[in-house]
């Protein structure tokens, strides 16, 4: 209690000397228990294989290349690997998770399932996917991919119905129509199995519109049934549009178990890959760095939409991405953001990373770690120190109670002494 006035005085002196400790626009970590998922901008192996080895290709400091804390692949992303044949097995584990990827599936790629489809739907899918990834990696240490085995008792094989350019969808798989069916008004099932992970992120997708085939329109209908628990997950087409729709996906977080994929109309879909989530941890917000092209290419903001507090902190540069290796690789602003991975930091917040945990000019929003509890507000004339009022209020109450007790005791002894004098 006697130290509080000294603390106030010292803090005010520090404030008067201009110590502000503002939040910095970087991603960092509390300690060495961290991991980064990325693409070419943090893919050290890709740089090693170029000639010459030009590290200006990356936004990552090359001193981190041998840290063992990076899973990155040039030309890829977690979303791209999840849905398409262009696959990289992103794998990593840490208490503090950082993502700097996503640019390799943007409106620039203009993906849509059919010629009359919609890339806007796929951007929506991307946002929903990363929302699940970020939320779950705030409570899980480990992320990797696993194959999902399935058994279909018919003779039809999976078909590459959904493709555009070099991208071919293979998760979920489409099971082609059986030869003895004259149309798509039929019910069909397949078993699939999830095992070996704590939980899984799997896709459940439908064409949300009137799907035309041979002059007939069909409403998509897909369900997953957990045979162990009896829980059913399903989607039915609700739109009446006949053009401009595409493959709408929901991303389910499922436990291990035996499942049944069911289609009541159109083609059966069944998951073939899943995000494997392992090793529950104490809640730790993930950090996401905006992943975008130079303005010459069209980007999207889906990782920003997916990254929301309290489970996620989003970091971005205020300027156009302009690389030094080429316009899309080696930007100074994003290199600065990733430079925070070179050191530990005590406090993370929505506004940025705090380098010190004593006082700050900014109150941390959605704080995590050992964060400043006071703010130093500099006016043009004199520094004014503002502190958490609770300790001062409690101190005032205690002092008030002490004063009252002292006054009561003084009155008591004065009255008692006067009475005894009178009696004498």
From Swiss-Prot:
Positions of glycan attachment: 54, 89, 153, 236, 301, 316, 358, 417
Disulfide bonds: 44-65, 113-162, 197-276, 205-249, 307-312, 347-371
Membrane topology category: Single-pass type I membrane protein
Subcellular location as annotated: Virion membrane; Host cell membrane
Record keywords: Disulfide bond, Glycoprotein, Hemagglutinin, Host cell membrane, Host membrane, Hydrolase, Membrane, Signal, Transmembrane, Transmembrane helix, Viral envelope protein, Virion
Annotated stretches, region: Esterase domain 1: 7-127
Alphabetized GO MF terms: host cell surface receptor binding; sialate 4-O-acetylesterase activity; sialate 9-O-acetylesterase activity; sialate O-acetylesterase activity
E.C. numbers: 3.1.1.53
Record PTM: N-glycosylated in the host RER.
Residue intervals on the Virion surface side: 17-392
TM region(s), chain numbering: 393-413
Intervals, Intravirion compartment: 414-424
Signal peptide (UniProt feature, chain positions): 1-16
InterPro entries reported for this sequence: Capsid_hemagglutn, HEMA, Hemagglutn-estrase_core, Hemagglutn-estrase_hemagglutn
Superkingdom field: Viruses
Record region (Receptor binding): 128-266
Main location: virion
Quaternary structure, from the entry: Homodimer; disulfide-linked. Forms a complex with the M protein in the pre-Golgi. Associates then with S-M complex to form a ternary complex S-M-HE.
Function description: Structural protein that makes short spikes at the surface of the virus. Contains receptor binding and receptor-destroying activities. Mediates de-O-acetylation of N-acetyl-4-O-acetylneuraminic acid, which is probably the receptor determinant recognized by the virus on the surface of erythrocytes and susceptible cells. This receptor-destroying activity is important for virus release as it probably helps preventing self-aggregation and ensures the efficient spread of the progeny virus from cell to cell.
Assigned protein family: Belongs to the influenza type C/coronaviruses hemagglutinin-esterase family.
Protein name: Hemagglutinin-esterase
Gene that this sequence comes from: HE
